[in-house]
Amino acid sequence: MIESHEFNDINDSHVGVDINSLESTTSTSASYCATSGGFMNLTLISGHLKQVWVEYDGVKKQINVTLAPINVDKPKIPLLSLSGDLSPIINKAMYVGFSSTTGSILTSHYVLGWSFKMNGKAQEVAILNFPSCLEVKAELNI
């Protein structure tokens, strides 16, 4: 990751929610809520696999973003919560996505699994069905 002062990034290892802008509506340093209840810092450029849950409750108008290492169950407390009505920007057909930047450092970023559900809970992503590259197998101890 890279810190961009142009877009008011808080640091070079953060998670943000950007809505129709490159400037985050809200952001925080990358971390996850451990089972002990405290937040543990994560370094996004560590090379270790991570999983992210992005959830929007249209009734409550609540966006939650939860982050954790790949071998950790979904934390009970999200990393970011944001109240806001997304209905004015959600269309019947549209694109959503993830982005990442590392400045001048050459890196690759992969989305290894994706689950989406309208009006309900998305299915769990089957980690064992991830691509069988060595890095994934080593990280998952399989």
What are these regions (language model features)?
Residues 1-142:
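Polar, low-complexity loop segments and adjacent catalytic/binding residues used for recognizing
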